[in-house]
């Protein structure tokens, strides 16, 4: 897969990043290099390799699952700038 200049501009627009015409070729090269690396990774033979979540073997500490009443809604919303009936109020962002 190859990224063209129009795709670089589209990605920049979606990311809300100002990109000048002079920067487009450099970014195009960088994105193409990243995609080439990802394509190269897909060719690696991983048959027989177990999936892992960490480079060091570790087990997560488990706690007893205990049912509680909760009743902490007031504590949760006390630092919010705007609340109503223990719900967070946020400014409208879509018209």
Swiss-Prot record:
> What keywords would UniProt list here?
ATP-binding, Ligase, Nucleotide-binding, Protein biosynthesis
Q: Which reaction does it catalyse?
A: L-glutamyl-tRNA(Gln) + L-glutamine + ATP + H2O = L-glutaminyl-tRNA(Gln) + L-glutamate + ADP + phosphate + H(+); L-aspartyl-tRNA(Asn) + L-glutamine + ATP + H2O = L-asparaginyl-tRNA(Asn) + L-glutamate + ADP + phosphate + 2 H(+)
Regions that span the bilayer: none
Q: What is its EC number?
A: 6.3.5.-
* Highest taxon in the source lineage: Bacteria
MF-aspect GO terms:
asparaginyl-tRNA synthase (glutamine-hydrolyzing) activity; ATP binding; glutaminyl-tRNA synthase (glutamine-hydrolyzing) activity
What is one GO biological process annotated to this record? regulation of translational fidelity
Enzyme class, UniProt record, top EC level: ligase
Indicate the quaternary assembly: Heterotrimer of A, B and C subunits.
Q: PANTHER family per the record? A: GLUTAMYL-TRNA(GLN) AMIDOTRANSFERASE SUBUNIT C, MITOCHONDRIAL
Family classification: Belongs to the GatC family.
HAMAP family named in the record: GatC (MF_00122)
What exactly does this protein do?
A: Allows the formation of correctly charged Asn-tRNA(Asn) or Gln-tRNA(Gln) through the transamidation of misacylated Asp-tRNA(Asn) or Glu-tRNA(Gln) in organisms which lack either or both of asparaginyl-tRNA or glutaminyl-tRNA synthetases. The reaction takes place in the presence of glutamine and ATP through an activated phospho-Asp-tRNA(Asn) or phospho-Glu-tRNA(Gln).
> Mind telling me what this protein is named?
Aspartyl/glutamyl-tRNA(Asn/Gln) amidotransferase subunit C
UniProt lineage:
Bacteria, Pseudomonadati, Pseudomonadota, Alphaproteobacteria, Hyphomicrobiales
